[in-house]
C-alpha cells in the first residue's frame, strides 16, 4: 500500500449480516437511472459493488465462483471511481485505486490457477484429444490450484480490510459537483485510449500491450453499462460487441497463462503435446480479437460519444 491513509477516510465500520443461505448472490445493479443525480447514483453503485465483493468473500471463501465474482465487483468499482475522477481529485482517486489494486492482485492468482484447469479441458475437448492421456498434467494443474486455495485463504482477511476501507470512504466522496459532461469526457477518454492502443497492437506482437488494451476494452464496457440508460437502445449493440471482444481476449489471456505454467513445469510427451497445441491457438485468437477491436474502435472519439444523451 503506497502513501499514508488520508485524514478524510470515513470511520464507520461495515458489518455484514450472517450468511444463512448458500444460494448464489444476486448480481448488483451497474447502471445509473434516468433522472438520478449522478454523484449520488455513482456512490450507490460503488456501495453495491463493494458490498457484493465482501459478501462473496465472507467466511474466507476462496471457492472459484465467489473469487471470480469478487474480482469482477472490484473491477466495476474501479470503473466507477475512474468515471467519477473529475470530482474525486487525484489524491483520493489514487488512494482508492491503490486499495482496489491491493485487493484484486491478491485474488488474481487464485482465479488464474483455477481457470488453467478449465482452459486445459476446453483445449483438449476442442482438439478431440482423450483426457486420460493428459491426466498427469491436469492433476498437476489441479494440485497447484488446491495449494493456492490453501495458502491464499489467509490473504482474505487482508483483502476484506482493503475493501472495507473503500466502503467506509464512499459516503465522503465529494461527487455533488459531477456533471453529465464530466462523464462524457471520461468515456470519450477511455475510448480514445483504447482506440490508440489497438492501432499499435495491430502493427506488432507486443503481448503486454495487448493485455493493456484488453483491460481498456473491459473498462469501456463497464462504463457503457454504467451509462446504458442514456444510450440509444440502452447501448445493447455496443455492449454486444465489446462483450464479445472481452470474452475472446479473456480466453487468449487464459491460454497465455496456461502456456506459461506448462512451460515452467515438468516435461513429458503429453505436456509437450499440450504446449504445442496451446501455442498454435494463441496467435489466431489474438488476431481475431484485434480485428474485432479495429472494427469496434473505427469511429473517431467524437463520433462514438455523440449518441450519449448526457
Write out the residue ranges for each language-model feature.
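Cationic, histidine-enriched alpha-helical/coil surfaces that engage anionic ligands
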Residues: 8-310
